[in-house]
Amino acid sequence: LIKLLKYPFRYHRFRKRFAKVLRELRPDITISTLRRELNFINKLDDGSIKIGEFHVTRYAYGAEALKSGNPLLKWLKAQLNKKFVRNLSQLKRVVLLTHEEAGFWSELTNLSVIPNPIITPLNKISDGKAKRVIAVGRYAPQKGFDMLIDSWALVAQKYPDWTLYIYGDGFLRAELQEQIERLGLTEKCRLEHTVNNIADKYGESSIFVLSSRYEGFGMVIT
């Protein structure tokens, strides 16, 4: 409740600071990933072209993600969605990841599709025989590696000859390592640093796990 009461003040402060930075930088182009600034970025007078990038699907974000049969909530969802679309329509362009996703935005005429650009050559294709499971991503709450490690503690009891390798780096590394040790998984779950040949690591594994709490079309599955 306290966080909810403080939100209007924090949002006003965020908007003020955001606008100040743009006025000082005077960029030619401002690219937003369409979070809190979506409601006001098109109104800023810094002179830059405003472009939005939408990294998740429409129906898993914001008001569209609300699921309820309550008439009042349905009405609220419709109003929030109208405001959302109106804000998007005022941007110079809205960039999506796939043409399929573009089909969900029939109200907009300012869409562009730019797929994830990384194409990693596959020097080795998994034969499915290695008893290795791989996960890749930042060591951050979004990626859900804490949940994955908890789940792996159950898997390791039934399949002790399998090993989970999690490739990445981030501020949760020490916390995740402590979790691994606490669950007695030191030999069954390994935190590996980022590598340049991640495609080879996929080829050395039999199973890939995406444990994210929320995710767009991630580059780890591209």
Where are these regions (language model features)?
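Carbohydrate-associated surface elements
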Residues: 100, 117
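Short His-centered aromatic/hydrophobic patch
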Residues: 32-37, 54
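Short acidic alpha-helix that forms the nucleotide-activated donor recognition element
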Residues: 174, 196-205
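Membrane-proximal helix-turn-helix segments that form the acceptor-binding/catalytic region
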Residues: 16-20, 73-94
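A conserved mid-protein helix/loop that constitutes part of the nucleotide-sugar donor-binding site
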Residues: 131, 135-154, 160, 171-177, ...
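Acceptor-binding helix/loop patch of EC 2.4 sugar-transfer enzymes
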Residues: 2-5, 52-79
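Aromatic "clamp/platform" in nucleotide-sugar-dependent glycosyltransferases that forms part
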Residues: 194, 213
